Amino acid sequence: PSATATDGAFGFGFQLGARYNINDLVSVGASYTSPQWFDDFQWNSANANPNLPNFGAPIVIEFGLDVPAVWAAGIGVTPLPGLTLAADGKYLTYESTDGFRDAGFNADGSVAGFGWKNIFVVAVGGEYWIKEKFAVRAGYNYSENPITEEQVFFNVPAPAIVQNHLTLGAGVKIARRLQVDLGYYHVFENSITGPIPNPSLPPGATVTSSMFEDSILL
């Protein structure tokens, strides 16, 4: 397909999990989500290596991009009627996943991969129902940054560098089977700077990625 078209790929994966209620107040759980394996994506491009005789010639690029495996565990506590507190942790295995494992350039000048490292993610949150009619919610999530300074250039299209996330929400039960929820999601700004591996640029040339986000969910 051309650069303005879309491409699809078949993929599959699986998930295993278990939950155990220790007592009426505390429950624990754990899960494993396998990598989500996809066929390679393909698109039309041109040879980007100026040192090769076929520089600029049309080529078909293939890129394997899977979703990493995730190990997770969590705990939930209900200390008061209507109040639920929860905490969980996750470990994402980017370093063994196609598309994220490799880094740098291929011989034809295409990017070999994003070069992400494995990360831990922790999250805490709470929900409180008022008279079983109205709910208020809050949560916080911290994620390690999978992108090192050396790989910033290769991740300009996908700057997943944010680390601190805050969520607020509310809900109301309108009827027995009808509920309306509103949520606010804020990602605190984070920036990272790294070198540009291009010999045509002056020594010490750098690129900076910066990202933040605000979302409202209904």
Task: Map each language-model feature to its residues.
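Outer-membrane beta-barrel porins/channels
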Residues: 1-218
